[in-house]
From Swiss-Prot:
Biased composition (Acidic residues): 286-319
Enzyme nomenclature, EC number: 2.7.7.7, 3.1.11.1
Lineage of the species this protein comes from: Archaea, Methanobacteriati, Methanobacteriota, Stenosarchaea group, Halobacteria
The protein's name in its UniProt record: DNA polymerase II large subunit
Catalytic activities: DNA(n) + a 2'-deoxyribonucleoside 5'-triphosphate = DNA(n+1) + diphosphate; Exonucleolytic cleavage in the 3'- to 5'-direction to yield nucleoside 5'-phosphates
Name of the encoding gene: polC
Family affiliation: Belongs to the archaeal DNA polymerase II family.
Length: 1198
């Protein structure tokens, strides 16, 4: 580690220590559940693992194994299992306890001690009996095991089996009905919830038959299995979500990875894994069915792979036509298309985004670079941070603005074709755009292909590749780059032709058109039209050839449909007249068509090979046959994509939002208003403000005072829970595990009671304690009841101050703000709305080139734990800082800490960053702000939270708010209650301990020519890994925190729209109209297919689901909220006499039916789809039609 990096971390930890000292002093004085700060510091992964699990001795052993460079983390998990079996780690008296400790620790280790899976995803481990009397291990998994990922899920089973063998427990021997139950259950869970990988029934049965550990779990979902119910060793008839995840996404999907480790263990033998991997487990009927499926699939594959077949034929006959290498189109991203979220390109369709390799400074780690002009031209549906579902290389990506790639090409209403590289120009012309011919380039870094193990797709022929080709041809590229008269990226047409001819190099990309999208027939038509055209000066005068040294050579050709279409397909900028088409800078185009400067053809006929290349749909071979220079494929790979989630920058509230975790039952009304509860009385005889609620039963250890508060009202000592057995009415002391078992009846005692609380006194006392009046806020909201184990309420004083400053409490007492995650490795002070002086005060002394930092436009490399907040987050943090200062001053009696008057005062302050599925917070430092609705941070910061940037969103908390107000006592006592809670904090990020996806990000300033050439052959990414430096290459070196170079710059991190149109448009109908209108404009999109998919995946399921819900609905009292299966006969609520109403209304059932029918007709959907809609329409009409009898008159019968 470099000295300046060490200084950075020392500064962070010094600021953290200052905040910790203030928080410690404050918690001694207030009414918090404990006097200690409840978020322990973990300086490394070993600390996190031990703190989350609470198992002494684990951290020391993990550090020993981490120090061994030859020991992988998976192997370390197995070593730890042996330690648990041999009583070297942990203090477990039972064999089941040892297995449980080993499994939990293995999952914690494999997830870097960050996610909640080890404590929430594994409920318990127990010993059961086989039919032969032997014992076996049964593991109860729960839903939160999902956050561990498939590898950790699968290895948890292997660790359990390994531990089992070491302590002498037999294997699980599945009964036949249990095997069948597993198969039915996985199918049910996949239909109801969905699995990333859903094994077939025969595969599931095969795994269940051979699994040495019984996989069990808690019931999830409402659906129950129809067969194999009420089994003796299975507690529920519902699908067990945790078990399904481990068996499907773990064992079945990760079998090859498990086999790698079973082969290293003498004690564990899973020979059946090879059959699972090879698919040789099939027998009988299933084999026949599988063969039939395979036959069907082979025909499809053969159709898709026709190009490959042609290519192989080319080996036999040298001149045989063949197509260029191309990745197969993938349609998976189009599944589950939602109304209002547009498709930007069908799979690999011309006109869609063009793949370009590289990494911008705000790019990488599952993001996609898009030109800001393209964002505006697609009606602002894409903004910074918007998620897109993409064809390749991954499943999804977060959008980032990159203005150093090519922008979109559009056709205007007057017929002109123009490329747009300026976002301001895009805004000016977008109302006049008739069609979007091309969406521009789509930047993807090489590391994404490594991470997804996706074969490299052919690269766009970009300037960075061409300059290396030019250098290989003998040019002094460095001298050209240094010359003020030469622009290597955007040269003049004359210069581009000179280079091509002098050095025998390929034509510059600026003048290399998309010949691979043009068929040979239209190529010939364009060549013929060009030969019939003439050169014109800008004033329209006709010339036979362009003058020597002319700055612009304008070609005028006769207008015809084939010629116009050819120019549009090639993306040649031109203007359209009544009878002519005018092309500026046309000399490279003319020469590419095989014409002389005098517009004379140099060829008569194309060869058979050129005419037949790629079935005549690709003119690249024809161009290279007639042009006097080499012409490369400009954009061979198109990437289909559609909009996913919109970007997010919003405060995190409970639903509904509350200010304090203090229970008031129903007394606060629908608003949960504490002031209303303070005056509430059930009857005239009741005392106003007295409310019966369920709270903790606690006792002061110093003076024996009984109370429900965390602190004794008499002596202010921290109170302890008092456990009482309801049946025996005796006090029970808890054991070491915290469970209180009655010695008489052996039932579990609890420390909860129903008690009458005088809310009026509590409320008035709280206002008095902090010196506030009721007019300091509009409303103070509490909760109806507490969901924590001991039901300890939070002091109302904190809620008063939150309400005053307009912030709310989360489930653990903290104040949070959510933002979409995006990466950035270098920043400018100007775009962060800070000054160079402010950055220098934070330790940024030099820019990325080593020059002293003096100006706001200099690029500086971002420190690993520095974060950039959205404007919304900055305002929220400012309000939170005011709340914390008032809390310190008015409640704890200390000096204010932040004294923040505006958001500049937040710069340099520490925050917690945290992902929803984890239990570990990461300390960060604010260095600036952005107008985009996202949170920018170093990729390693996001990876430390076990997140990438494919559209994920995480929260930030002001550091001192978390230290003062977080308490485990407030966390819900239910499955998943400890997820999304900072049970531990990481004060320093170790790159070696974060999620390894971030290690696959490339950190170079340019890609070598050999890499680009390898993409033409669609090489495996591993074959070129030695050519490009990745983050993992610097681990353990002095540069592991530095040197994150980029290939592309961008002018502003927030370029393009601040918000996606999905968030600014009105109702769903308005969004869908905009979606379909955009589909009509995009050349790469089939609007009929979009309409069909919206109806099939959104409208039809919604209408059918709402129709079913209407028939099964409950009714609800509008006053007290009481629910009934049917409306009481009186029509009034039995509890309060209020009006009872439906919970599902006619409007929600038929809201989409008319629109769906209209869309199906307008966009020419299949007759099958139209018939389904008509049938549904009749079903809806039959339910809601007015069938009351009308009085008939005699005239009705005449």
């Amino acid at each position: 580690m470099r000295e300046d990096d060490e200084q950075y971390f020392r500064r962070l930890e010094s600021d953290l220590d200052t905040a910790l000292s203030v928080a410690r002093e404050a918690r001694k004085r207030g009414g918090d559940p404990t006097e200690d700060i409840e978020i322990p510091i973990a300086k490394d992964m070993a600390d996190r693992v031990e703190n989350i699990l609470g198992i002494d001795g684990v951290a020391e052993r993990v550090r020993e194994m981490e120090a061994d460079p030859d020991l992988s983390r998976e192997e370390a998990a197995l070593e730890l299992a042996a330690d648990f079996a041999n009583d070297e780690v942990g203090d477990y008296e039972t064999r089941a306890g040892k297995v449980e400790g080993a499994v939990r620790t293995a999952v914690a280790l494999l997830t870097e001690g960050v996610v909640a899976a080890p404590i929430e995803g594994i409920d318990r481990v127990e010993l059961l009996e086989n039919d032969d009397g032997t014992e076996f291990i049964n593991i109860y998994y729960a839903g939160p095991i999902r956050s561990a990922g498939g590898t950790a899920q699968a290895l948890s089973v292997l660790v359990a089996d390994y531990t089992r063998t070491l302590i002498g427990i037999d294997e699980y021997k599945a009964r036949n009905d249990e095997t069948e139950r597993y198969a039915e259950e996985l199918s049910l869970y996949d239909d109801e919830t969905g699995l990333q990988y859903a094994p077939k029934d025969e595969e599931t049965k095969f795994i269940a038959e051979h699994m040495p550990i019984m996989l069990d779990g808690e019931a999830t979902g409402d659906e129950e299995v129809s067969g194999f119910r009420d089994l003796e060793r299975v507690d529920t008839n519902s699908a067990r979500g945790g078990m399904c995840l481990v068996l499907g996404e773990g064992i079945a999907q990760k079998a090859p990875k498990i086999q790698r480790y079973t082969s290293q263990l003498d004690e564990v033998d899973w020979p059946w894994l090879q059959d699972l991997i090879d698919g040789t487990y099939k027998t009988g009927e299933d084999t026949d069915e599988a063969d039939a499926d395979s036959d069907d699939g082979t025909d499809e594959d053969a159709a898709d792979d026709s190009d490959i077949d042609d290519s192989s034929a080319g080996d036999e006959e040298a001149d045989a036509p063949s197509g260029p290498p191309r990745p197969d189109p993938q349609k998976k991203f189009l599944r589950d298309l939602i109304a209002g979220r547009p498709v930007f390109g069908h799979p690999s369709e011309p006109g869609g985004f063009r793949l370009r390799y590289g990494r911008a400074r705000n790019h990488g780690f599952a993001t996609a670079g898009v030109h800001p002009a393209a964002m505006h031209l697609i009606d602002d549906f894409l903004a910074t941070g918007t998620q897109i579902k993409t064809e390749r290389p991954g499943k999804a990506a977060g959008v980032v603005p990159v203005d150093t790639i090519e922008g979109p090409t559009v056709k205007l209403a007057n017929g002109d074709v123009r490329r747009v590289d300026d976002p301001e120009e895009a805004l000016e012309i977008r109302n006049g755009v008739e069609a979007i011919l091309d969406l521009g380039e789509y930047l993807v870094n090489y590391g994404e292909f490594v991470e997804n193990n996706h074969p490299l797709s052919p690269a766009a022929y970009a300037p960075e590749w061409w300059t290396q080709d030019l250098a290989a041809a003998g040019a002094d590229v460095q001298a050209l780059a240094d010359s003020p008269r030469v622009d290597l990226e955007h040269p003049s047409a004359e210069q581009a032709l000179e280079w091509a001819e002098r050095y025998d190099a390929p034509l510059h990309p600026e003048y290399t058109y998309l010949w691979h999208d043009l068929d040979v027939e239209r190529f010939e038509a364009l060549a013929a039209a060009a030969s019939e055209g003439h050169w014109a000066e800008t004033d329209g005068a006709q010339q036979t050839r362009p003058p020597d040294g002319a700055a612009e050579s304008t070609l005028v050709v006769p207008r015809s449909e084939p010629v116009r279409e050819a120019l549009e397909v090639l993306l040649v900028e031109h203007t359209q007249g009544e009878e002519t088409l005018t092309v500026p800078d046309a000399e490279p185009l003319v020469r590419s068509l095989g014409l002389t400067e005098g517009l004379e053809r140099t060829w008569d006929e194309l060869s058979t090979a050129a005419r037949s290349y790629d079935d005549g749909d690709n003119a690249v071979r024809a161009v290279n046959e007639v042009a006097p220079f080499e012409v490369r494929e400009r954009a061979p790979t198109r990437i289909g994509c559609r909009m996913g989630r919109p970007e997010k920058s919003e405060k995190r509230d409970l639903s509904p939002a509350v200010h304090t975790l203090f229970p008031i039952g129903e007394a606060g009304g629908s608003q949960r208003d504490i002031a209303e509860a303070a005056t509430h009385a059930e009857s005239m005889q009741d005392t106003p403000g007295e409310v019966e609620v369920q709270v903790g039963r606690r006792q002061c250890p110093a003076c024996d005072t009984e109370t429900f508060r965390a602190r004794c009202p008499d002596c202010e000592s921290v109170t302890d829970p008092r456990y009482v057995c309801y049946d025996c009415n005796i006090d029970v002391d808890p054991d070491e595990s915290g469970r209180a078992i009655c010695p008489n009846c052996e039932r579990e005692a609890d420390a909860v009671q129903n008690r009458t609380v005088n809310v009026h006194e509590e409320y008035r006392s709280a206002l008095s304690n902090v010196g506030e009046r009721e007019n300091a806020f509009d409303v103070l909201k509490g909760v109806k009841g507490l969901s924590s184990e001991h039901k300890v309420p939070e002091p109302i004083e904190k809620g008063v101050l939150r309400a005053k400053h307009g912030v709310s409490a989360f489930k653990d007492g903290t104040v949070r703000y959510d933002m979409t995650d995006l990466p950035v490795t270098s920043v400018r002070a100007a775009e962060l709305d800070v000054t160079a002086d402010q950055l220098r005060s934070l330790g940024y002394e030099t820019d990325i080139h080593g020059e002293p930092l003096t100006h706001e436009d200099q690029l500086v490399e971002l420190r690993v734990q520095d974060v950039v907040l959205s404007n919304g987050a900055a305002e929220h943090m400012l309000r939170t800082a005011d709340f914390v200062d008032d809390l310190l001053e008015q409640y704890y009696g200390l000096e204010p800490f932040y004294d923040a008057e505006d958001r500049d005062d937040i710069v340099g302050e520490l925050v917690f960053g945290m992902a929803p599925h984890t239990s570990a917070a990461v300390v960060g430092r604010v260095i600036g702000f952005t107008s985009a609705a996202v949170g920018y941070a170093h990729p390693y910061f996001h990876a430390a939270k076990r997140r990438n940037c494919d559209g994920d969103e995480d929260c930030v908390m002001l550091l001192l708010d978390g230290l003062l107000n977080f308490s485990k006592t407030f966390l819900p006592d239910q499955r998943g209650g400890r997820m999304d809670a900072p049970l531990v904090m990481s004060s320093r990020i170790d790159p070696a301990e974060i999620d390894d996806e971030a290690h696959n990000m490339d950190i170079v300033s340019s890609y070598p020519r050999a890499f680009f050439e390898a993409t033409r052959e669609m090489a495996d990414p591993g074959e070129v890994e030695s050519l490009i430096q990745l983050g993992e290459d610097t681990l353990g070196t002095a540069d592991e925190y530095r040197g994150f170079e980029h290939t592309h710059d961008t002018v502003d991190l927030a370029a393009g729209p601040d918000l996606s149109a999905y968030k600014t448009l009105g109702d769903m109908m308005e969004k869908m109209d905009a979606q379909l209108e955009l589909s009509r404009k995009l050349r790469s999109v089939d609007e009929t297919d979009v309409a069909e998919r919206v109806i099939e995946y959104h409208f039809l399921p919604d209408i059918i689901g709402n129709l079913r819900a209407f028939s099964r609905q409950e009714t609800r009292c509008l006053d007290c909220g009481e629910k009934y299966r049917r409306v009481p006969l009186t029509g009034d609520c039995r509890e309060c006499g209020g009006r009872v109403n439906l919970t599902v209304h006619q409007g929600s059932v038929n809201k989409y039916i008319d629109t769906a029918i209209q869309v199906a007709e307008e966009y020419g959907c299949r007759e099958y789809t139209k018939q389904r809609l008509r049938i549904l329409d009749r079903a809806v009409e039959s339910i809601f039609e007015d069938d009351t009898n009308k009085q008939s008159g005699i005239a009705d019968f005449m």
